[in-house]
């Protein structure tokens, strides 16, 4: 099984050395591998970006794409992220989207950080994903673990809010807050919930 990974380069797995994948539990419920491949086909996924701990899964899933007669998406396996104290923990969903949302992190702040994490390129506070996506080059991602810094994420979040247009946040602002008020308040906040202290 061969493919060219967008981060790791040419990959080769000998199927004779791989165990048969388990795709269904004894109770009839499906495990991740086959449903994920089917979803990718159904949704027209062209690129799969995930952690390097899934490289072996990719070899298995590529066989599934081939068996289903589907085009293979491109794969990029990035180095695993570390935190300020070493390995990141998934415990209690501390790094899940819901947790970031509850902390007032704007989706674009997370997208901006993740698009550059593991590269030498600076993280830019952007308010639209399309220009950022157009500049992603997987050849710039290193193989060494990248450090996820929540303080850096908070700073990017603030910078994004400082340049966010009124129209983009109007529905989320307190009733009666107009464009002039938003323009006066936005340089002073680090998350949208901070508006309440000014209005």
Where do the model's predicted regions map?
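Active-site cores that bind ATP or allylic diphosphates and position pyrophosphate for catalysis
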Residues: 1-77, 82-88, 96
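Catalytic adenosine-cofactor/nucleotide-binding cores of aminoacyl-tRNA synthetases and other
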Residues: 56, 68-199
């Amino acid at each position: 099984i061969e493919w060219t990974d967008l981060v790791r380069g040419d990959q080769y797995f000998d199927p004779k050395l791989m165990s048969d994948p388990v795709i269904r539990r004894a109770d009839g419920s499906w495990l991740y591998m086959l449903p994920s491949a089917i979803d990718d086909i159904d949704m027209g996924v062209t690129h799969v970006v995930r952690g390097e701990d899934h490289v072996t899964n990719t070899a298995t899933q590529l066989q599934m794409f081939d068996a289903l007669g589907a085009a293979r998406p491109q794969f990029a396996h990035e180095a695993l992220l570390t935190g300020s104290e070493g390995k990141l923990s998934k415990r209690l969903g501390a790094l899940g989207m819901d947790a970031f949302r509850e902390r007032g992190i704007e989706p674009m702040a997370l997208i901006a950080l993740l698009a550059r994490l593991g590269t030498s390129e600076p993280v830019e506070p952007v308010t639209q994903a399309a220009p950022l996506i157009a500049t992603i080059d997987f050849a710039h991602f290193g193989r060494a673990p990248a450090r996820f810094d929540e303080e850096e994420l908070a700073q990017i979040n603030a910078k994004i809010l400082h340049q966010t247009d009124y129209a983009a946040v109007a529905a989320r602002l307190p009733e009666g807050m107009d464009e002039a008020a938003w323009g006066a308040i936005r340089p002073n906040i680090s998350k949208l919930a901070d508006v309440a202290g000014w209005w």
